[in-house]
Amino acid sequence: MEIKFTIKQVVAVGIGAALFVVIGMINIPTPVPNTSIQLQYAVQALLSIIFGPIIGLLVGLIGHAIKDSLAGYGLWWTWIIASGLFGLVVGLFRKYVRVINGVFDWKDILIFNLIQLLANALVWGVLAPLGDVVIYQEAAEKVFAQGIVAGIANGVSVAIAGTLLLLAYAGTQTRAGSLKKD
């Protein structure tokens, strides 16, 4: 199976990964060690909805890997993969959110937020901590606490910033049937 990317998709991955890194350097601490509120997932969610699951996956994987490399504490693959999976899961449900058609009403906002909250709960509350226990032999209590806090924090930040980004994006799109012949 050969996957071909358009120039637009390649640029979206590059810009998305760069934004993931830059925005990811802003860490708002939480009471749980090594866990902070992260704002870059709102941008990743936006790109996942606009460009689909593969672009969302790549933005998370590449962006998080570069961010970890620059941070100096090494690559934490379980969380890098979780970031990619967040974009993948959100992107899989893009057809239910109509921003491409210039529509992002209450129904779309509700659907988007249900999707992203479930994706955050899955990747941060289950997959990342489980990976830490299995691969890195981390203490389950510690990593599940980190994962739950990260999932809640990311869910709230995407609910606010992601919704605002999608509202702004939908406003730039022409609604189907909105043009009339004079």
Swiss-Prot record:
It is found in: Cell membrane. It holds the Pfam family ECF-ribofla_trS. NCBIfam families: PRK13661.1. InterPro entries: ECF_substrate-spec-like, UPF0397. Its main location: membrane. The keyword Transferase does not apply. The chain crosses the membrane at residues 10-30, 46-66, 73-93, 109-129, 148-168. Belongs to the UPF0397 family. This is UPF0397 protein SPCG_0463.
